[in-house]
Amino acid sequence: MKAIHVNWTAPFFNKERLRGHGFSITKNISSKTYELPNYQILYTILSAIRWKKHNGPIKLYTDSIGLSYYQQIGITQLYDEIDTEFLDNLQNVDPAYYWTSGKIQALQNEKEPFVFLDQDFIVRGEVPADFYYGDIGIGHWEIPRGSYYFTRQQWESEIKHIEIPHNYNCNAYSPNTSFVYFGTASTVDEYVKAHKKLINSGENEVPEWFWLATDQGILGHVIREHEYHTNTLTDRIFLADNDYAKPEDRRFGYSEQWYYPVEHDKTKDQFEWEHVWLAKVVFANDPEFMERECQRYYDEIWDLGGSNYLYYFNLNKYWNKEKHGH
């Protein structure tokens, strides 16, 4: 199965206006030229290598600045195909407000079926064949709760440029969009069309939560409106804005990250995948944890035979003579 990565650099050049819990490190990069932190380079390499090893070819959508940077750090050979034309010509999008729009709009260039793969999503095996028997496949659903989700009343009072979509269900599960299989052309077309309507906000200010509505929220709406059959890699459902509690804390009523529906298939969890996701928030506050994770990514890339992609000088500190040889 073909997958795509998307690296749109426009948000970097608007980083002072970026909003969200995962941008602390990026916003602190002082360079005026495009640059990525080590962890982002490493998980991008690992994500691509793992996909190619287990599942098939991978294509990169980026812009000319992104391509030049990838050439500089020596990772363009990860990709079977690279497209810069689309993102070079992407216009009329605020990359600070809608920083995932580049990846969403790039989808419309692909022929089905294919997988969109966030660069921080690592698949460590062959995706089960029955995952592809449907219109759409996602990593998992999320229970919407907290500041990144909204009520109908919030939309009606805070969003001025467009009415809430007809039949929008604020209580329904939200699909995590870090890993999405598109099995038909209509799934892509309807998703991108709905997304583009929402981001046409002109000069209107929008609250921070709105970007997620234009990304995960609207995909869930499209799935329900068109009754697209949706498979998941796991039956576990992520609870947004949870307490990150451990099982022993249940007696106090603290909430955990993951929950199973009453009827579920635990055998799905034999399939191994990792989404760096929330760890990126922790990285900003715990640099030692970040360095341990970078070392883990580096070691795994090395063990997979990917040493050719680790020559970038910023990554040299993870090389260990005893562990990695000469």
Where are these regions (language model features)?
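Short, flexible, basic/aromatic active-site loop/helix in glycosyltransferases
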Residues: 157-171
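A structural signal for isolated positions on well-ordered beta-strands in alpha/beta enzyme cores
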Residues: 57-61, 115, 261
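Catalytic core and acceptor-binding pocket of nucleotide-sugar-dependent glycosyltransferases
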Residues: 169-284
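N-terminal anchoring/stem segment of glycosyltransferases
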Residues: 1-91, 282-325
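Short glycine/proline-enriched coil/turn segments at helix->beta-strand junctions
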Residues: 53-57, 109-114, 132-135
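Short acidic donor-binding/metal-coordinating loop in glycosyltransferase active sites
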Residues: 119
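Conserved donor-nucleotide/metal-binding helix-loop-beta segment in metal-dependent transferases, i.e.
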Residues: 123-159
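A conserved donor-nucleotide-binding helix/loop in the catalytic core
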Residues: 38-41, 46, 88-116, 124
